[in-house]
A protein has these predicted regions:
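Short, contiguous strand/loop micro-motifs
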Residues: 7-9, 174-175, 199
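GST-like fold's C-terminal all-alpha helical module
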Residues: 78, 87-90, 94, 98-196
Length: 210
């Protein structure tokens, strides 16, 4: 890959949505730079530059002189580019189905109001009580020897789940995964230990900060 094909990911020093893109770029071993921006720097020097920051928010992915915005659009762009969306339309549907369900949890946790913390934890618990069985069903129906969601290989669904969901739940100390969701914990631990995401966790994962 030539220098003009290098990716630059602009994001804050947190996991959140940016961690999925970091994990994805790490997994495909892309030539990329993890450009961490302080919030005040973003507001003063980046937010109002429409040619750079179309919607006034991060993450932004720079590639070949173009600035890509909106995290899910970036994730799908990279997923398609690196053949992580399945081998046919049915597999792509299954992966997109899972991605949409993963997105459902994001509003439950992305609340900065400290007074709502206990309510937030209960919402997250309810979500996983409903969805844990569904997620594990996908893995079992895949019939592979590993914990993959589709096509018995690593796909965008695995990267999303292994990066964002792990970091999200790891930041919620009030939820004891091993006691409350033991099977889901095994699945998450598999993603953390698997070589596919090893570089992400060693270099780019931000411990206990969602």
């Amino acid at each position: 890959m030539s220098l003009d094909e290098k990716y630059i990911l602009y994001y804050f020093d947190v996991n959140a949505r940016g961690c999925i893109i970091r994990a994805l770029l790490s997994y495909v071993k892309a030539n990329w730079e993890n450009k961490v921006i302080e919030y005040n720097d973003f507001v003063q020097n980046y937010k109002h530059k429409k040619e750079f920051c179309e919607y006034g928010q991060l993450p932004i992915l720079e590639y070949k002189g173009k600035y890509y915005s909106q995290s899910m659009a970036i994730i799908l762009f990279l997923g398609k580019k690196y053949n992580l969306m399945g081998d046919n339309e049915d597999e792509e549907y299954e992966i997109n189905n899972l991605l949409c369900s993963f997105e459902d949890i994001f509003p439950l946790i992305h609340d900065q109001n400290q007074e709502k913390k206990s309510a937030k934890y209960e919402k997250v618990r309810r979500y996983f009580k409903i969805y844990e069985e569904k997620y594990l069903k996908h893995v079992k129906e895949n019939k592979g020897k590993k914990y993959y969601f589709a096509n018995d290989k690593f796909t965008l669904a695995d990267i999303y789940f292994g990066a964002l969901i792990y970091s999200m739940l790891n930041s919620l100390k009030e939820i004891e995964m091993e006691k409350e969701f033991p099977e889901l914990k095994k699945l998450l631990d598999f993603y953390k230990s698997d070589n596919a995401l090893k570089e992400f966790y060693e270099k780019y994962y931000i411990n206990s900060i969602f």
